Amino acid sequence: VTATVHPAVERADLLIDLKRYEEARELLARRLAEDPEDVRAWVKLARSHLGDEKDGPKALEATERALALDSADTGALVMHAHALRAAGRFLETEDVLREVIRLAPDHWYGYALLANWLWRIRAIRSGQANGGQVRREDQDAALREAGELAQEAIRLGPEEVFAYEVAWLIADMAGNRTVADRLDEAILRLDPQHEQALARRTKKAATAPGVNAAQAATLYADALAAAPGSAPMRSGLDDASYRLLRGIRWLALLCLALAGVGIDLFATEGRTQRELPLPLGQRLWDLVPMAVVWTLGALLRYRRLRAGVRVNLRSLLRRRTWPRIVLAQASWAMACALLITQIPWTDRTVPQVLFWAGLLATVATIWFDRRKNG
């Protein structure tokens, strides 16, 4: 039995890492033709079959050849467990992984992989024994045992991210949010760019009570700088950006209300309405509070946003329909407000029509799109 790793096997392993599986298989086939007793070559051949083709039977055949040469090779046993799962024999993996732990009781990976699969195996067995229903007590017992295995994996491999990932999944399945949050922090200490943990922590912070849209968008933009490929955080940034855009409709409606007040649009009992048309000075003065509203409510807020958030706002308008609808509604309401205040009307009928047209076209969808993310 070959004791050391042959250079050809090392090259094949690198090819597999690069997802060049066919080239790796060709290299391993030549190596096994030279030395059919190379255990590592058989193991890497199994790994290549699990890469692109997910061919469980071929991977299983390769691991069986490796184990026939050395039944105590833990690397071959671990790959054999993966091959069994790919071949549809998932329930058999428990015994294989327990053998891995027996042979290497001080190595973390066997504990972590068994913890990751054990609760699933027990759920399948419980379902098979109970007419397709997983009993709650069986699930709880499986999660407890899996949690103990995960903690042992962490103890043996305190710097191994996978052990913490498994422990997080088990805590999440058990509904233990406190432990899950603590494990997320541990994962991020080891890997500050871990996409899933970063996305979960960011979402928790962004959706906390009292966090407004601008703050949420900033949190997501900062997190995306560390993990730019994260789809959940990109979606979260889009959602927060859309919430920011929705706010401009309220600014436009406020300006519409100011326009109505400026022209005394609706008569009130005991109060004489202004004579129309309003003088030019008054009409120009009516623009001042509108300018203040947009300066304080939109322009200054926009300038304070992170560059990434500003870029995403523009991108969202190009990519999504509802943000464009929101912008169009705000523009329509503002157009109505300007028409009401800047044309020297001699009668209030048309301004009233403009007021209701600007108001109803916007208010009609505000409640409807509250839950939309753009």
Residues of each region from the PLM?
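Alpha-helical protein-protein interaction scaffolds
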Residues: 4-237
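Helical anchoring/docking segments at protein termini
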Residues: 238-374
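N-terminal leader/linker segments that initiate helical-solenoid repeat arrays
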Residues: 1-22, 304-322
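Residue-identity detector for threonine
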Residues: 2-4, 63, 74, 93, ...
